[in-house]
Amino acid sequence: MTYAIIEASGTQLWIEEGRYYDLNHIPVDPGQSIILGKVLLLNKNGEVTLGRPCIEGVTIKATVMRHLRGKKITVFKMKPKKKMRLKKGHRQELTRLMIDSITS
C-alpha cells in the first residue's frame, strides 16, 4: 500500500493513488493536470521515507476534477437587551483533485 502525506492549499493530507480529495480552491481549470511537490512523508510498500521538511524527488500527479462549494457555515451574533441581531453565512470554494500517481 502506497500512501503519502502532502502539504497543499495550506493543509496537510494523507493521500493514496486512485482516490479524490477536496482542497481549498486552486486556480486551475477542470481537466488539467497539476504536480504537487511538497511531500512530507512517503510509505511505499512498508518502506517509510520521512522528509525534513520535504522529500526531494517525489512528486504527486493529480487531475482537477471540478470546482465546488463546501457546506454552508452559519454565524449568528446577538447582543442581549438590544435589538442587535446579525446572521451571516459562508461557503468555502473547494477544488476536487483525483490523485493519478505517486512517483519517487
From Swiss-Prot:
Superkingdom, taxonomy of origin = Eukaryota
- Where is this protein chiefly located? plastid
* Cellular location(s): Plastid, Chloroplast
**Keyword Chloroplast set for record:** yes
Instruction: Identify the keywords attached in UniProt to this record, alphabetized.
Output: Chloroplast, Plastid, Ribonucleoprotein, Ribosomal protein, RNA-binding, rRNA-binding
Q: Cross-referenced InterPro entries, in alphabetical order?
A: bL21-like, bL21-like_sf, Ribosomal_bL21, Ribosomal_bL21_CS
Is Chloroplast set as a keyword in this record? yes
Q: Name one GO cellular component term.
A: mitochondrial large ribosomal subunit
List the PROSITE patterns hit by this protein, alphabetically. RIBOSOMAL_L21
Q: Which PANTHER family match?
A: 50S RIBOSOMAL PROTEIN L21, LARGE RIBOSOMAL SUBUNIT PROTEIN BL21C
Query: What's this protein's family per the entry?
Result: Belongs to the bacterial ribosomal protein bL21 family.
- Assembly state and interactors? Part of the 50S ribosomal subunit.
Give the protein's function: This protein binds to 23S rRNA.
Q: Report the protein name in the record.
A: Large ribosomal subunit protein bL21c
